[in-house]
């Protein structure tokens, strides 16, 4: 075979053929169309060599088997038929692997996803390592697609219908223990003996597939299948609000295969794959995927970052505890937490312990690993142990003088190279750095709550921040598992600035007589994960609204909230879920009682009308203000690219991913249409809807954001 091939064949002395997967020049193995000829040549050689007793597929990469198919292949398809042909080619290749006359074993270490798992499913057996890096799944639905190389047909027959539906409809990934329990893999072994174990299994006679559990056998029958599909379809529709056509097609394709046979199932799978590839939803989701990949590769600066050996954190509260967790347990860096109160340190340590303990209970990690990771976190009530910290992240109260004091203390007690990164959500970084002796090493690093779950961070340099500081903080954020966007130091930064008018308008709709649940339902139907009112309850009404006066002072009355409404709610001691009093009623332990609205809220906010707008009208008012503000941020250079604006909105506030983010969405509508809608809303509701100069200019010139943002503003 050609040494540049991604697939190479080696026939051992014991007559076991080992096919090694190693895509040249790439960190991850991904399947590309041009590899089909390489694999077919190997399969032909195996079929012709009558001495071969078995076959093992194994990866040469350090931490992945096959991470999936190359998504660019789909972008090169111009029609549904071309994408369907791509799927049929994949199906045929997998069928040829499955048809080999000797046992074929997939030896899996690391990520085995998408087309990688479909290849493993085509094998006669699967062994995986017990490593935490090993995950197995079919995430195509997250790109608005379905598995197109036989996954919708082989997986249900291997693991049962309910497990397969859960995996394919959600993109859920299984860890080794879960994969073994479900029957997805036959054996778990240490990485050191993976090849040896796979070879031994390949020498054995082909084993008959394991019998499915009784529950799965019942669900596989016509009656059980009918009931399950009806239940899952209803549940899926509630979750997707009809915005993701892939889920419906997945159900149809799997049902076709089970009721009409595999041949019909494969045919339906290929057709559905082709049609879904051409949908706007899949295109938008793929755009988000590509944009996210680009952001993760973007160093944030042309300058080399500094070293990152140890990190300090000021404040052991909710944010400090979360930042300590991602720094120690994801970035793998030693963390020292300073809090004036020992209870604060204990809180932060307990926070990480609880998160790790949940992983132990779910058997994602072992108790020894939990202890090893916790050992990276220490605490102090003074600056002992801070002298050599490379970065100190401040996560104290939103008080300017306190943060300035923290800067002075860090400059006094830490090294000359130490970077001060503030987790402020509202205070300008230039103000925090105003009295710094080394302002070039002061920067904003805005995490979102809960830190361990939210993927986005905003990196906020002020005018004097050095390029090296920017590069170092971007590097740290990536190590912490975050997707960083670099934004300008202006009031509200980017995410909170576009979120505020959206929240304000929802509150204004309440005062006009719209019901809480009507507003939230309308925006969830549009595609947000939760409505704006529920979002306020979740983040805390006090926390979620504290930015509004800051924005109003900076940008004027378009950011003003309805008079006295927020203060009236807060004066009634309503902070949302965290104190069990908000717009919604909360039961024991802060759990919502079927998301019922507290009727008292309408008396508190002094409703002044009986508005009865349609869901579309409600959505339009809230979303158009967000879009207009995003366009302003683009014009002012708050974000460097439309790409960063889309990633920030999708990852930071849950802007509907299937729309591609605010800038992709505006491009799909067209600037002229966005301007026309804003002008109509201005005539109906006032000047806060006045279209910004950026949109007016783009409408006049027929421009779009993505075509005009190819160059870096940096």
UniProtKB/Swiss-Prot annotation:
<dbReference type="InterPro" id="IPR006108">
    <property type="entry name" value="3HC_DH_C"/>
</dbReference>
<dbReference type="GO" id="GO:0005737">
    <property type="term" value="C:cytoplasm"/>
</dbReference>
<dbReference type="InterPro" id="IPR008927">
    <property type="entry name" value="6-PGluconate_DH-like_C_sf"/>
</dbReference>
<dbReference type="GO" id="GO:0016509">
    <property type="term" value="F:long-chain-3-hydroxyacyl-CoA dehydrogenase activity"/>
</dbReference>
<dbReference type="InterPro" id="IPR036291">
    <property type="entry name" value="NAD(P)-bd_dom_sf"/>
</dbReference>
<dbReference type="Pfam" id="PF00725">
    <property type="entry name" value="3HCDH"/>
</dbReference>
<keyword id="KW-0456">Lyase</keyword>
<dbReference type="InterPro" id="IPR006176">
    <property type="entry name" value="3-OHacyl-CoA_DH_NAD-bd"/>
</dbReference>
<feature type="region of interest" description="Enoyl-CoA hydratase">
    <location>
        <begin position="1"/>
        <end position="190"/>
    </location>
</feature>
<comment type="subunit">
    <text>Heterotetramer of two alpha chains (FadJ) and two beta chains (FadI).</text>
</comment>
<comment type="similarity">
    <text>In the central section; belongs to the 3-hydroxyacyl-CoA dehydrogenase family.</text>
</comment>
<comment type="function">
    <text>Catalyzes the formation of a hydroxyacyl-CoA by addition of water on enoyl-CoA. Also exhibits 3-hydroxyacyl-CoA epimerase and 3-hydroxyacyl-CoA dehydrogenase activities.</text>
</comment>
<dbReference type="GO" id="GO:0070403">
    <property type="term" value="F:NAD+ binding"/>
</dbReference>
<keyword id="KW-0276">Fatty acid metabolism</keyword>
<feature type="site" description="Important for catalytic activity">
    <location>
        <position position="118"/>
    </location>
</feature>
<dbReference type="Pfam" id="PF00378">
    <property type="entry name" value="ECH_1"/>
</dbReference>
<dbReference type="GO" id="GO:0006635">
    <property type="term" value="P:fatty acid beta-oxidation"/>
</dbReference>
<dbReference type="InterPro" id="IPR006180">
    <property type="entry name" value="3-OHacyl-CoA_DH_CS"/>
</dbReference>
<feature type="site" description="Important for catalytic activity">
    <location>
        <position position="140"/>
    </location>
</feature>
<dbReference type="Pfam" id="PF02737">
    <property type="entry name" value="3HCDH_N"/>
</dbReference>
<comment type="pathway">
    <text>Lipid metabolism; fatty acid beta-oxidation.</text>
</comment>
<keyword id="KW-0413">Isomerase</keyword>
<dbReference type="InterPro" id="IPR029045">
    <property type="entry name" value="ClpP/crotonase-like_dom_sf"/>
</dbReference>
<keyword id="KW-0442">Lipid degradation</keyword>
<keyword id="KW-0443">Lipid metabolism</keyword>
<feature type="region of interest" description="3-hydroxyacyl-CoA dehydrogenase">
    <location>
        <begin position="306"/>
        <end position="714"/>
    </location>
</feature>
<comment type="similarity">
    <text>In the N-terminal section; belongs to the enoyl-CoA hydratase/isomerase family.</text>
</comment>
<protein>
    <recommendedName>
        <fullName>Fatty acid oxidation complex subunit alpha</fullName>
        <ecNumber>4.2.1.17</ecNumber>
        <ecNumber>5.1.2.3</ecNumber>
        <ecNumber>1.1.1.35</ecNumber>
    </recommendedName>
</protein>
<dbReference type="InterPro" id="IPR050136">
    <property type="entry name" value="FA_oxidation_alpha_subunit"/>
</dbReference>
<dbReference type="InterPro" id="IPR001753">
    <property type="entry name" value="Enoyl-CoA_hydra/iso"/>
</dbReference>
<dbReference type="GO" id="GO:0004300">
    <property type="term" value="F:enoyl-CoA hydratase activity"/>
</dbReference>
<keyword id="KW-0560">Oxidoreductase</keyword>
<keyword id="KW-0963">Cytoplasm</keyword>
<keyword id="KW-0520">NAD</keyword>
<dbReference type="GO" id="GO:0008692">
    <property type="term" value="F:3-hydroxybutyryl-CoA epimerase activity"/>
</dbReference>
<dbReference type="InterPro" id="IPR012802">
    <property type="entry name" value="FadJ"/>
</dbReference>
<keyword id="KW-0511">Multifunctional enzyme</keyword>
């Amino acid at each position: 075979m050609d040494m540049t091939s991604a697939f190479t064949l080696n026939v051992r002395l014991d007559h076991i053929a080992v096919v090694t997967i190693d895509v040249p020049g790439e960190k991850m193995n991904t399947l590309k169309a041009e590899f089909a000829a390489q694999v077919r040549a190997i399969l032909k050689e195996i079929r012709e060599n009558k001495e071969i007793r078995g076959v093992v597929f194994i990866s040469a990469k350090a931490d992945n088997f096959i991470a999936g198919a190359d998504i660019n292949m789909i972008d090169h398809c111009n029609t549904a038929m071309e994408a369907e042909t791509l799927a049929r080619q994949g199906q045929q290749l997998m069928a040829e692997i499955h048809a080999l006359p000797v046992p074929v074993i997939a030896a899996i270490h690391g990520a085995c996803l998408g087309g990688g798992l479909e290849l493993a499913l085509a094998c006669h057996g699967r062994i995986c390592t017990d490593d935490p890096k090993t995950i197995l799944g079919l995430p195509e639905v997250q790109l608005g697609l379905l598995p197109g190389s036989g996954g919708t047909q082989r997986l249900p027959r291997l693991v049962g219908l309910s497990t397969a539906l859960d995996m394919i409809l959600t993109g859920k990934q299984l860890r080794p223990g879960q994969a073994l329990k479900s029957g997805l893999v036959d054996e778990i072994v240490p990485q050191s003996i993976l090849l040896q174990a796979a070879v031994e299994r390949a020498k054995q006679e082909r084993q008959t597939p394991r019998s499915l559990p009784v529950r799965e056998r019942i669900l596989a029958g016509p009656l059980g299948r009918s009931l399950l599909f009806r239940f899952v379809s209803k549940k899926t529709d509630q979750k997707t609000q009809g915005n993701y056509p892939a889920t419906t097609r997945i159900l149809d394709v799997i049902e076709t295969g089970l009721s009409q046979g595999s041949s019909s199932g494969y045919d339906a799978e290929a057709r559905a794959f082709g049609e879904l590839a051409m949908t706007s939803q899949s295109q938008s989701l793929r755009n988000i995927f590509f944009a996210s990949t680009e952001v993760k590769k973007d160093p944030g600066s042309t300058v080399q970052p500094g070293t990152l050996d140890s990190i300090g954190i000021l404040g052991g509260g909710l944010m400090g505890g979360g930042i300590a967790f991602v720094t120690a347990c994801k970035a793998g860096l030693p963390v020292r937490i300073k809090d004036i109160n020992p209870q604060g340190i204990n809180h932060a340590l307990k926070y990480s312990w609880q998160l790790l303990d949940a992983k132990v209970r779910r058997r994602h990690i072992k108790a020894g690993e939990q202890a090893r990771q916790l050992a990276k976190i220490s605490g102090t009530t003074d600056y002992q142990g801070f002298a050599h910290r490379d970065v100190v992240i401040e996560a104290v109260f939103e008080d300017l003088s306190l943060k300035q004091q923290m800067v002075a203390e860090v400059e006094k007690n830490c090294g000359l190279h130490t970077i001060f990164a503030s987790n402020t959500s509202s205070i300008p970084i230039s103000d925090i750095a105003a009295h710094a002796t080394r302002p070039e090493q002061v920067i904003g690093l805005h995490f979102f709550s809960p830190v361990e779950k939210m993927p986005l961070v905003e990196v906020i340099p002020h005018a004097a921040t050095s390029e090296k500081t920017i590069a170092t903080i971007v590097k740290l954020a990536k190590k912490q598992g975050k997707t960083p966007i670099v934004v300008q130091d202006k009031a509200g930064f980017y995410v909170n600035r576009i979120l505020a008018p959206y929240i304000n308008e929802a509150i204004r709709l309440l005062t006009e007589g719209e019901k809480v649940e009507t507003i939230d339902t309308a925006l969830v139907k549009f595609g947000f994960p939760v409505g704006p009112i529920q979002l306020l309850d979740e983040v805390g009404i006090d926390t979620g609204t504290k930015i509004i006066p800051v924005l109003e002072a900076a940008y004027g009355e378009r950011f003003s909230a309805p008079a006295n409404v927020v203060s009236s709610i807060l004066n009634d001691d309503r902070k949302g879920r965290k104190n069990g009093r908000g717009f919604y009623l909360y039961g024991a332990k802060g759990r919502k009682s079927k998301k019922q609205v507290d009727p008292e809220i309408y008396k508190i906010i002094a409703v002044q009308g009986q508005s009865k707008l349609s869901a579309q009208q409600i959505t339009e008012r809230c979303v158009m203000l967000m879009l207009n503000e995003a366009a302003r941020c683009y014009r002012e250079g708050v974000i460097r690219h439309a790409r960063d604006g889309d990633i920030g909105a999708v990852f930071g506030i849950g802007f509907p991913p299937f729309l591609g983010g605010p800038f992709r969405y505006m491009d799909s509508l067209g600037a002229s249409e966005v301007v026309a809608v804003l002008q109509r809303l201005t005539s109906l509701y006032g000047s806060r809807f006045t279209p910004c100069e950026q949109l007016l200019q783009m409408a006049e010139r027929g421009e779009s954001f993505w075509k005009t943002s190819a160059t870096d503003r940096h």
